Amino acid sequence: MEETVNKILRAQETRAQLYKELEDALNANQEKKIGLEQMGIIVQLVTEGLNEVSSDIRNYQASLTKELKLLVDSLQEKERSKLQATVKLEQLKVVSTNSPVENTQISELEARLSSLSKEINDILQNMKDEI
């Protein structure tokens, strides 16, 4: 079981690296260092990578205890929410006119992402504690 949890933790590290790649690409696009075509390719590759990580984690989950399975379910749900919030945030940033309403929405999404990251880290720590 410890080996399976370690596989999940490594997959989660891969997921974090994919988010970093996405963040770097978004920043490069905003700074006009890469164009929309390159951005589209990167988004597609990151999406495929995230889907693969999620699938791998679900496959590993099958051999875990009930408690660990529940933690994995929670992890996957938090990660899904994080991805949705990330996409919404980037969409808002692209069309933002710096209105007070948009700035409030951006701040709320950034706070949500920070909260989700903490929750994800807590789940990962709980998984480590279970083994």
Curated annotation (Swiss-Prot):
Keywords on record: Cytoplasm, Nucleus
Pfam family, one: DNA_repr_REX1B
Subcellular location: Cytoplasm; Nucleus
Keyword Ribonucleoprotein: no
Gene Ontology CC: one annotated term: nucleus
Main subcellular localisation: cytoplasm
InterPro entries: REX1-B (IPR039491)
UniProt signal peptide: none
Superkingdom classification of source: Eukaryota
GO terms of biological process kind: pericentric heterochromatin formation; subtelomeric heterochromatin formation
Cytoplasm found in the keyword field: yes
Function: Required for heterochromatin silencing within pericentromeric repeats and at telomers. Facilitates the recruitment of Clr6 histone deacetylase (HDAC) by interacting with histones. Also interacts with Rad25, which mediates heterochromatin silencing in DNA repeats by recruiting the RITS complex. Together with Rad25, forms a regulatory hub that defines heterochromatin silencing within tandem repeats via linking RNAi and HDAC.
Quaternary organization: Monomer.
Name assigned to this protein: Heterochromatin silencing protein rss1
Annotated source species: Schizosaccharomyces pombe (strain 972 / ATCC 24843)
Name of the encoding gene: rss1
